Amino acid sequence: MFAIYKSTLLLLPLILILLITPQVSSFLQPIQPPISPQVALIEDKARLGSTPPSCHNRCNNCHPCMAIQVPTLPTRSRFTRVNPFSGGFVRPPSSLTTVLDQYSNYKPMGWKCHCNGHFYNP
């Protein structure tokens, strides 16, 4: 009878600790107020970079169709119009172009959908 009483005394504190521990740990976690939609929108706009587009049904039934980042080609023209009415074009001075290209480290990236070595527009 003493053995049953002794084992009960050992199990009772263990059971109490197991029952109380989840409740205590829930009190220790910091409670954060709910985020308003305006704050969430500002946080999304403040994030750098862009998010990948959905490539669902973009690769002509090729699977897996995945969004990847690819370098984009510069869109600026190397020729400028002299007179809009004359239709003539002139190349800008090469020294100006060289200076601008020399110090430019901007490498624009864009998104494409990729599947089996082929690229598709998202």
Swiss-Prot record:
It comes from the Eukaryota. Keywords: Developmental protein, Disulfide bond, Secreted, Signal. Residues 1-26 form the signal peptide. GO terms for biological process: guard cell differentiation; stomatal complex development. One of its GO terms (cellular component) is extracellular region. The keyword Disulfide bond applies. Disulfide bonds join C55-C113, C59-C65, C62-C115. Its main location: secreted. InterPro entries: EPFL. The keyword Isomerase does not apply. It is found in: Secreted. Transmembrane segments: none annotated. Belongs to the plant cysteine rich small secretory peptide family. Epidermal patterning factor subfamily. Controls stomatal patterning. This is EPIDERMAL PATTERNING FACTOR-like protein 1. The lineage of its organism: Eukaryota, Viridiplantae, Streptophyta, Embryophyta, Tracheophyta.
